[in-house]
Amino acid sequence: MRILGIDPGLARVGYGVIDTSNGQQQMLDCGIIRTNPGIDDGVRMVEIASDLRQLIRRWKPQLAAVEKFFFYRSSTTISVVQARGVIIMTLARFRVPMVEFPPMQIKLALAGSGHAEKDEVLDAVMRELNLDQPPRPDDAADALAIALTGWFQR
């Protein structure tokens, strides 16, 4: 199964693509969709949708796993929620089934504790995907953790 993990954001959307054929997890791609903070939010969301479309067309995921936004008070809360809506809409448009996980569930699935530290989750990602180097940037590593959670929780 090919799974696209997504760590939503407006400035940076982390993505990670894994393949789980033959009972092993393998990283195929990871990175970020970056938008320019100096332009209108609507244009930034169009960029996110466009880049996500390209990823979907390239990798043809059978499942998308998206981090569920947990509410907190911040000046970026609304824009992140809006960007997440664009991501969900784009996945639906391409009929990619989607599952959502809150951060604590991702930490629990990978590190065994919902209160695990970021480095514990990163170590688990590296171990599960047999990586010698940590994926960069952090948003991409987070997206791989989300994709792995999608696989583990299926």
Swiss-Prot record:
Keywords: Cytoplasm, DNA damage, DNA recombination, DNA repair, DNA-binding, Endonuclease, Hydrolase, Magnesium, Metal-binding, Nuclease. GO terms for cellular component: cytoplasm; Holliday junction resolvase complex. GO terms for biological process: DNA recombination; DNA repair. The keyword Ligase does not apply. Disulfide bonds: none annotated. Mg(2+) 1 binds at D7, D139. It is found in: Cytoplasm. One of its GO terms (molecular function) is magnesium ion binding. Its cofactor is Mg(2+). The active site is at D7, E67, D139. It catalyses: Endonucleolytic cleavage at a junction such as a reciprocal single-stranded crossover between two homologous DNA duplexes (Holliday junction). Its EC number is 3.1.21.10. InterPro entries: RNaseH-like_sf, RNaseH_sf, X-over_junc_endoDNase_Mg_BS, X-over_junc_endoDNase_RuvC. Its main location: cytoplasm. It comes from the Bacteria. Binds 2 Mg(2+) ion per subunit. Mg(2+) 2 binds at E67. Belongs to the RuvC family. Homodimer which binds Holliday junction (HJ) DNA. The HJ becomes 2-fold symmetrical on binding to RuvC with unstacked arms; it has a different conformation from HJ DNA in complex with RuvA. In the full resolvosome a probable DNA-RuvA(4)-RuvB(12)-RuvC(2) complex forms which resolves the HJ. The RuvA-RuvB-RuvC complex processes Holliday junction (HJ) DNA during genetic recombination and DNA repair. Endonuclease that resolves HJ intermediates. Cleaves cruciform DNA by making single-stranded nicks across the HJ at symmetrical positions within the homologous arms, yielding a 5'-phosphate and a 3'-hydroxyl group; requires a central core of homology in the junction. The consensus cleavage sequence is 5'-(A/T)TT(C/G)-3'. Cleavage occurs on the 3'-side of the TT dinucleotide at the point of strand exchange. This is Crossover junction endodeoxyribonuclease RuvC. It comes from Prochlorococcus marinus (strain MIT 9303).
